[in-house]
């Protein structure tokens, strides 16, 4: 980022390669994702409209985009290292670029960084969640319960996490938040907050250990991906309740199994009881042809007699028919 700020020529080169259409799309708060396929076809996903064709881009322009991003990230991308991952220097959007031989022709995806905060009330108005579900989330925040937000790819986990964090700041403005991410996606307006980022040399587990010395009231993790899940559970369980994290899992109950898998990467001892004790609420959000919706919310009571004791607020068929978001 600093390198690019000091070299406006790189910015201009990237803008020229992207073209006016994609530069405008990156400024559009309704845009979720920009996708270029190896055949040169472009697709753009917009809130409320889904994915739609958006013209084409030449292989030369795509290769220039990927190369310019790699240059800005002080990385190399070529046939030996054909994949580049990082943040697009314009706007900090998430970028994934690929070159042959892993693809036939240059391809990339840009996940636009959300610039618009969607409050829980808007989720209710648009039918993404019910008033009862919003009330459950607010009650969990007020009670300093630990909340996991689960969902598949592009389901809206981070956007919902931002809404939950907004509620935390509103209800407990005195709390000090420490937020840990791999890529900058979390929005936090708290007066007392520390944002930490992983790097090539500092992983999430190391950041979590450092977090314990930063006197957090609440610990937020952008996405739990690996054995750092165990470190997070320990942090939440040692005087830092009321945290938020997202996890890649299609349902609320499968999020518990996913946590088991992740903690197993760091410990040979099963962590069922720890998970049952520390995780309080799991909110599952999904993307459907009709839009995103909170599929279910489960409250985790404990792990006993070989199973998790939970209370579930699952989307019923009647509510599913009414869903129009």
From Swiss-Prot:
GO terms for molecular function: ATP binding; ATP hydrolysis activity. Pfam families: T2SSE. Its main location: cytoplasm. Signal peptide: none annotated. Coiled coil: none annotated. It is found in: Cytoplasm. The keyword Nucleotide-binding applies. It comes from the Bacteria. The keyword rRNA-binding does not apply. ATP binds at residues 151-158. GO terms for cellular component: cytoplasm. Keywords: ATP-binding, Conjugation, Cytoplasm, Nucleotide-binding, Plasmid, Transport. Belongs to the GSP E family. This is Probable conjugal transfer protein TrbB. It comes from Sinorhizobium fredii (strain NBRC 101917 / NGR234). The gene is trbB.
């Amino acid at each position: 980022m600093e390198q690019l700020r000091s070299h406006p020529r790189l910015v201009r080169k990237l803008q020229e390669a992207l073209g006016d259409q994609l530069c405008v799309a990156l400024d559009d708060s309704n845009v979720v994702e920009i996708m270029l396929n190896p055949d040169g076809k472009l697709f753009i996903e917009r809130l409320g409209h889904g994915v739609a064709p958006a013209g084409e881009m030449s292989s030369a322009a795509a290769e220039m985009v990927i190369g310019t991003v790699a240059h800005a990230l002080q990385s190399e991308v070529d046939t030996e290292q054909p994949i580049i991952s990082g943040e697009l220097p314009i706007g900090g959007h998430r970028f994934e670029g690929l070159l042959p031989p892993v693809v036939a022709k240059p391809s990339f995806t840009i996940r636009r960084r959300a610039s618009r905060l969607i409050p829980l009330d808007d989720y209710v108005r648009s039918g993404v969640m019910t008033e009862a579900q919003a009330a459950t989330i607010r009650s969990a925040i007020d009670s300093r319960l630990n909340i996991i937000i689960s969902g598949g790819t592009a389901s809206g986990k981070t956007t919902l996490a931002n809404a939950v964090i907004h509620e935390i700041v509103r209800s407990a403005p005195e709390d000090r938040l420490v937020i840990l991410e791999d890529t900058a996606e979390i929005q936090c307006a708290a007066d007392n907050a520390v944002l930490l980022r992983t790097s090539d040399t500092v992983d999430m587990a190391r950041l979590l250990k450092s977090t314990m010395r930063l006197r957090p009231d609440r610990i937020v993790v952008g996405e739990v991906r690996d054995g750092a899940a165990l470190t997070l559970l320990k942090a939440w369980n040692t005087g830092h309740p009321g945290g938020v994290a997202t996890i890649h899992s299609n349902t609320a109950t499968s999020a518990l199994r996913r946590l088991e898998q992740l903690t197993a990467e760091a410990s040979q001892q099963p962590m069922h009881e720890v998970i049952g004790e520390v995780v309080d609420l799991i909110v599952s959000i999904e993307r459907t042809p009709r839009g995103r919706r909170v599929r279910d919310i489960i409250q985790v009571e404990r792990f006993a007699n070989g199973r998790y004791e939970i209370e579930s607020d699952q989307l019923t068929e009647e509510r599913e028919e009414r869903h129009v978001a």
